Amino acid sequence: MQKDGTRSSRRMEEGDRRNGSTGSSGSVSRELGRGFSYYNKYLARLQQNLRDTKRFFRDIKHTYSGAPGGPDTDIKGAEGDLGQLHSITFPRQEEEYLKLTVRCRPCIFILGQSCSSRGRVANSLLGDQLLPILTHCGSECCKRRRIRFRYGKQTLVSLALPEQYELVHELVAHQGKWDTIPEEDLDVPEDEEDPAHRLAELEVTLPHQLLQDVDIVVSPCRSSQAVSMTLEDYVDHVQSIVVYAVCEERLSQQDEEELTEIKEKYKLPVFFIRTSSTRDRLIGGSEGVRSALYEQLMELGFLKRGLCNCGAAGSGSTAPSMLVEQFEKLRQVSTFSRQVLQMHLVDAAIVLNMVHSRCLDLFINKAFDMHRDLQITPKRLEYTRQKENELYESLMRISDRKQEELKDMIVETLNSMREQLLEDAANMQFKDIAIPQNGEPVSVQEVKCCIFQIKELIISRLNQAVVNKLISSVDYLRESFVGTLERCLRSLEKSQQESSSHVTSNHLKQILNAAYHVEVTFNSGSTVTRMVWEQIVQIIQRITWVSPPTITPEWKRRVAQDAIESLSASKLAKSICSQFCKRLKSSHEAFAASLKQLEVGHSGRLEKTNDLWLRVRKDHAPRLARLSLESRSLQDVLLHGKPRIGRELGRGQYGVVYLCDSWGGHFPCALKSVVPPDEKHWNDLALEFHYMRSLPKHERLVDLHGSVIDYSYGGGSSIAVLLITERLHRDLYVGLKTGLSLETRLQIALDVVEGIRFLHNQGLVHRDIKLKNVLLDKKHRAKITDLGFCKPEAMMSGSIVGTPIHMAPELFSGKYDNSVDVYAFGILFWYICSGSVKLPEAFEKCASKDHLWNNVRKGARPERLAIFDEECWKLMEACWNGDPSQRPLMGIVQPMLQGIMDRLCRAQETGKALEDST
């Protein structure tokens, strides 16, 4: 079997008719064509975003892999530098799903109760009588095979195995002209024994405009092949649109089983169309009567009560099934197909955006970690060096002044232990020495061993007592210095990835443990032990015997007494202090050398971390944020459509705000149109959008409903991003001009503080708190808007942004934190307390922005007005303090402001009450 190069081909004589250009069937074809054009437009955008996403992950992988493009290429190869960035990958499951989605071609499956009903639907879709309408509808003897209509420049008919190859077979259609496909070619011959020919489908290629966008597959008769086999052959590599033609009043049991299998196995929505002409079949008539077919579909779970059966989209993630009981309304299949394809695109856009958002959050979290590492590691190193030096000096001072105390401690210890030592010595049982029970003398050698063991007892007891008292005298140093040092070293060791640095850190910890746990011991080779042993030898030499003594308790007690009296407390104290100082100095020098080595290792690591932080902040995160903005905007426009722009509400430096009556179920809305002029503005806008979408809803922040990218803005000359937000009554600037009561103004201040505090808790800095960025609802409650400059501290580059009169002095240095919002609130609070929008005198005198900035840097601030309450003025001054570290946190400002409001408003109410009483 091979491709038939001699198969019949002819051009259709009625090209216009075959292209669906006339009659009601032609309108169905045109409606479907428009729906597929809509699908193809957004599919192209999804494909482009997916290509850009794959390129992004490929670039990340190659940038941080030791062997770009190699077989073992993996971002984990740079895990030492990247940390969390090794998980910035395109998950395989999501990637395969998205690849399949964008490659799948739409396909309309025409199923149904009979060949006649299926043929009628196919003819109507194609606008021509291509399939014969049989009279023996549903006959068991029907053997019609599967039919597939595809696009081709010429009209061709052939037999082919699905997605494989064509069969060499002479068809009736090859023998001459035809308008309707011959029935002989449509049916499987009863005497056909070749299984390939029995399973083959009739493939028809037509130069039909509709077929450029979609294939049409007409299922075979049940006696020829089960419907499930048709779906099984195609469903995994096409976007399925299922049409079910009904020619009877009710579904048969076999129909129900067939539909149940489709629903449970493939979970596909179905468009049901009744092909027979009947009377009074309008669903939802004046009496609200439902047909038997409708009730059956309800029981099967294809239709739901409360949903319009005409195809209105539900709120779920899948398109609903539809029932149309008038064949004249077949054009509604275009609405159904559009919903089905749209939900495929929406699902793909959601998956793609989830990948973008997850990886973008990882980038931002890693930026936080790197930023903190860059800030804290040098401080930890300096802190470790400083604390170790303090510990060293403290211990040296202790050693210098403790010698006399040690002498007294030794004397005191010996006196307190004397009786117990003598008693223990008298009762001592010697090891490895046999003492006669009858009191006979022992040899000189055995006497020496006995004296040595008595010495060992005295030395061990004295050592333990002296060391315990010495350690207790420096315990506070061990707790306050050594514990902190060890914690800092553990932290530095974790952040240093090189193996050599692990050795250095471990060695450093060992030195600390050896040097600073102050364990004074009398080793066998130590000066103290030798000194004590010499004294014991002198004791032995002083005892002269004519013959070896008898080992009695009295003798043991006398030997112990002489040994104790021979010990010199001053010499012992001097020896202990000398040994302690020597070990301390040696350990201090080793510590300093090891710390220097560790610092060198961290210096190289921090340099790499800083480079990576800059790349994440300036390249990786903005690039991924733009892809995220595109995928989320695609999802929003598919679900809710393009918003209708109303009258202009205002304009700012970066965009125009319009009225938008309703969008996505929200009413009313405001629409901010932004046309980014360059890549930097695109990146800033994309990151702003991500931060806003990532924030939990908060009553003191303006809600962002969604975004749409308008590729046709300005006649297609530029691209605009439309941000749809909730619409409020007015901004604070207009509110103050109109006039607001003191209580209302203080409540607005509290609302602003609550909003700023929430942003700070989320790790964000607004950077542009001002009158026009505070919106008021009809109840005069405030919400913060315009997060255009809002960023996490770790993602800030030090850009000079904001509105001049609200900008903190440190903004001009490029090194600042969230305290710039506290400063801006202080200026805003000045306006709130003044009750007007008049500029402060110090700012009004400035002729230019540069003049204003210079004055602010020099300490210029708004003046105190006569109407200001003392506590309000102190709060303003605290907020705009020139030293950022002296400004109060918003968590402190909020209760202070609440107290001011309670006091002032209560005073006002008391005054009014007094006036009323008079």
Curated annotation (Swiss-Prot):
Residues engaged in binding ATP: 649-657, 672
UniProt-annotated catalytic positions: 768 (proton acceptor)
Domain Protein kinase per the UniProt entry, residue ranges: 643-897
Disulfide partners: none
GO biological process: embryonic organ development
EC number: 2.7.12.1
Spans annotated as Disordered: 1-29
GO-annotated molecular function: ATP binding; protein serine kinase activity; protein serine/threonine kinase activity; protein serine/threonine/tyrosine kinase activity; protein tyrosine kinase activity
Entry keyword set: ATP-binding, Cell junction, Cell membrane, Cytoplasm, Developmental protein, Kinase, Membrane, Nucleotide-binding, Serine/threonine-protein kinase, Transferase, Tyrosine-protein kinase
Major localisation: cytoplasm
Catalysis performed (reactions): L-seryl-[protein] + ATP = O-phospho-L-seryl-[protein] + ADP + H(+); L-threonyl-[protein] + ATP = O-phospho-L-threonyl-[protein] + ADP + H(+); L-tyrosyl-[protein] + ATP = O-phospho-L-tyrosyl-[protein] + ADP + H(+)
Subcellular location: Cytoplasm; Cell membrane; Apical cell membrane; Basolateral cell membrane
Name of one Pfam family that matches: Pkinase
UniProt biased composition (Basic and acidic residues): 1-19
Function: May act as a positive regulator of ERK phosphorylation downstream of fibroblast growth factor-receptor activation. May induce both caspase-dependent apoptosis and caspase-independent cell death. May play a role in the embryonic development.
Family label: Belongs to the protein kinase superfamily. Ser/Thr protein kinase family.
Stated name of the protein: Dual serine/threonine and tyrosine protein kinase
Species annotation: Xenopus tropicalis
